[in-house]
Amino acid sequence: MKESINILAIESSCDETSAAVVINGREVLSNIIASQISTHEKFGGVVPEVASRKHIEVISAVVQEALDEANFTLDDIDAIGVTYGPGLVGALLVGLQYAKGLAFATGKPLIGVNHIEGHISANFIEYKDLKPPFMCLVVSGGHTFIVYMKDYGEFEVLGETRDDAAGEAFDKVARAIGLGYPGGPKIDKISKEGNEEAIKFPRANFHDDTLDFSFSGIKSAVLNYLNKKEMKGEEINRADVAASFQKSVVDVLVDNTIKACMSKKVDKIAVAGGVAANSCLRETLVRECKKKGIEVLIPPFILCTDNAAMIGSAAYFEYIKGRRTSLDINAVPNLKLGER
């Protein structure tokens, strides 16, 4: 095998169009991201059809910019990695079809990547010496998982949400208290002005041995609290609501992840996904893990949000295991972690 494996990666699962050039799964030469946040902000959330159209408008330019920034041409690329699920089906198809076209035209192998595996692999970019096994908490707008990474490309899901993802709950609560979209960063910001002990919202876990989560209950509790306040004509302290809600979510994320770590006897927790940028989650996880002698690994914000560099990293580890993807592959919007 060549000393350096160069992956061109494409990500379009939701509202970011991204392309990157990644060497050997850990070195990023370029990571171009065209965000649609301003486009969807006025709608209060991502509109799937609008997202797909925006991907179509910019994908060619984004891929070319990624190659140019890396000072590469397609001749320098060994394989093309692309997200094929989970995500919005229309958005996924834009990136997938573009990648398939490139693979067909150049004769380069295609490697389909699970978006969640991509989030986990973002840690290999930031932490060059990181190797499995370790625990990973994946928290984003559409996904919440506690994952035991046994080996490269080998996962065991120990806990997951049974309804809303953590990021989805953040967005819905932010909308309810008039903060707008995207909810996660706005709740994080206003929470710093609030009292996290002001309101006792329920914790988002189950009273059994499972490490699963349920965020629909806490979301409903917040909405009920707001409705009662409005019916009584009482003032609503948005900062207190945001801080109390955030604490109830973060506490169960941290507690369950530490329990998972102890059960598998691993001393590293890697965090992935957009909600990993939340300052309360970061601070609480680091503080509580320090008490248990567990190291916490959190990539920078650019690698926590959806980006193609993480897809390039995951594609590399698939490539060296000899895995290739047929050009007949289709988008799988509900793809499960570990499925191929």
UniProtKB/Swiss-Prot annotation:
Q: What class of enzyme is it?
A: transferase
Q: Which cofactor does it need?
A: Fe(2+)
Which note does the record give on the cofactor? Answer: Binds 1 Fe(2+) ion per subunit.
Q: Answer whether the UniProt record assigns the keyword Ribonucleoprotein to this protein.
A: no
What the entry lists under Pfam families is as follows:
TsaD (PF00814)
The record's Gene Ontology cellular component field reads:
cytoplasm
Entry GO MF terms: iron ion binding; N(6)-L-threonylcarbamoyladenine synthase activity
The entry's function note states: Required for the formation of a threonylcarbamoyl group on adenosine at position 37 (t(6)A37) in tRNAs that read codons beginning with adenine. Is involved in the transfer of the threonylcarbamoyl moiety of threonylcarbamoyl-AMP (TC-AMP) to the N6 group of A37, together with TsaE and TsaB. TsaD likely plays a direct catalytic role in this reaction.
Instruction: Identify the HAMAP family for this entry.
Output: TsaD (MF_01445)
State what protein this is by name.
Answer: tRNA N6-adenosine threonylcarbamoyltransferase
